[in-house]
Amino acid sequence: MPEASSPRRTPQNVPYQDLPHLVNADGQYLFCRYWKPSGTPKALIFVSHGAGEHCGRYDELAQMLKRLDMLVFAHDHVGHGQSEGERMVVSDFQVFVRDLLQHVNTVQKDYPEVPVFLLGHSMGGAISILAAAERPTHFSGMILISPLILANPESASTLKVLAAKLLNFVLPNISLGRIDSSVLSRNKSEVDLYNSDPLICHAGVKVCFGIQLLNAVSRVERAMPRLTLPFLLLQGSADRLCDSKGAYLLMESSPSQDKTLKMYEGAYHVLHKELPEVTNSVLHEINTWVSHRIAVAGARCLP
């Protein structure tokens, strides 16, 4: 069989023709997941995952939303999970935003009158913020879990940022070091699952990717004053990856008339995989918040 006719395969060597996927504007294949309720969905919710991970880690959260008659959908970002692309490398952070909007457009074609929400964690929070700012009237609300708004001051000091920018010109693929999994959660079993997950990129963050994250932080700062949609912001006070001060900055900067911040004292970065009392609270907060906003959005759609 000629090579040109061979099916495209995931980095794990599974043919994309056997998997749900979309093809982005650059011709890259992205692995997708869908959690569909049995009847007509009350809302569409796109889940945007964080750096180095994949959308399968949001199954528990998605299943909860599905039980509320919501259609949850997601994809592995370029360079992540089962999607194509060099691991944790992207030519421009806008690619993540563009792909999100493409996926939303695709799903909305089948449900044009159903309100759509965004849910983003960490880097996925930054992607969601930028998507919402790009389409200020498109989304009915947004849920942010430990979003990337401010980088951790220890890892993004002025000297380190300058060094990274210089290295990006000469050694863009050199590693800045691995993500320390012990700072993700106080739940050791969840940390162990993270460490053993073969779909997570456990290699170090490359300089070129770190620069894209810094660029995203700058873009988010400029976008926050344009965020007028309702949003729920969940943040751990002891987050060592995304500075918790960013949560307060977003609350101050956004002109939204419907914005809620829930700060979890002592909690780490991955709140939906934290100690049971934190994770249960997070799921409850999301459940309550999104159910109410769906009712409001549905009322607006009535003739």
Curated annotation (Swiss-Prot):
GO-annotated molecular function: hydrolase activity; monoacylglycerol lipase activity; protein homodimerization activity
Pathway annotation: Glycerolipid metabolism; triacylglycerol degradation
Enzyme class: hydrolase
Domain of life of the organism encoding this protein: Eukaryota
Residue list for modification Phosphothreonine: 10
Tissue expression per record: Ubiquitous. Highly expressed in adipose tissue, adrenal gland, ovary, heart, spleen, lung, skeletal muscle, kidney and testis. Highly expressed throughout the brain.
Localization of this protein: Cytoplasm, Cytosol; Membrane
Topology relative to the membrane: Peripheral membrane protein
InterPro entries, alphabetized: AB_hydrolase_1, AB_hydrolase_fold, Hydrolase_4, MAG_DAG_Lipase
Record key words, sorted: Cytoplasm, Fatty acid biosynthesis, Fatty acid metabolism, Hydrolase, Lipid biosynthesis, Lipid degradation, Lipid metabolism, Membrane, Nitration, Phosphoprotein, Serine esterase
SUPFAM superfamilies: alpha/beta-Hydrolases
Statement: the UniProt record of this protein carries the keyword Transmembrane: no
Assigned EC number: 3.1.1.23
Pfam families in the cross-refs: Hydrolase_4
Residue numbers annotated as active site: 122 (nucleophile), 239 (charge relay system), 269 (charge relay system)
Modified residues (3'-nitrotyrosine): 58
Claim: Lipid metabolism is one of the keywords in the record: yes
GO biological process: acylglycerol catabolic process; arachidonate metabolic process; fatty acid biosynthetic process; long-term synaptic depression; monoacylglycerol catabolic process; positive regulation of vasoconstriction; regulation of axon extension; regulation of endocannabinoid signaling pathway
Family assignment from sequence similarity: Belongs to the AB hydrolase superfamily. Monoacylglycerol lipase family.
Functional description taken from the UniProt entry: Converts monoacylglycerides to free fatty acids and glycerol. Hydrolyzes the endocannabinoid 2-arachidonoylglycerol, and thereby contributes to the regulation of endocannabinoid signaling, nociperception and perception of pain. Regulates the levels of fatty acids that serve as signaling molecules and promote cancer cell migration, invasion and tumor growth.
Subunit annotation: Homodimer.
PANTHER family per record: PHOSPHOLIPASE-RELATED
Further comment found in the protein's record: Requires non-ionic detergent for solubilization.
Descriptive protein name: Monoglyceride lipase
Organism in which the protein naturally occurs: Rattus norvegicus (Rat)
Taxonomic classification: Eukaryota, Metazoa, Chordata, Craniata, Vertebrata
Gene that encodes it: Mgll
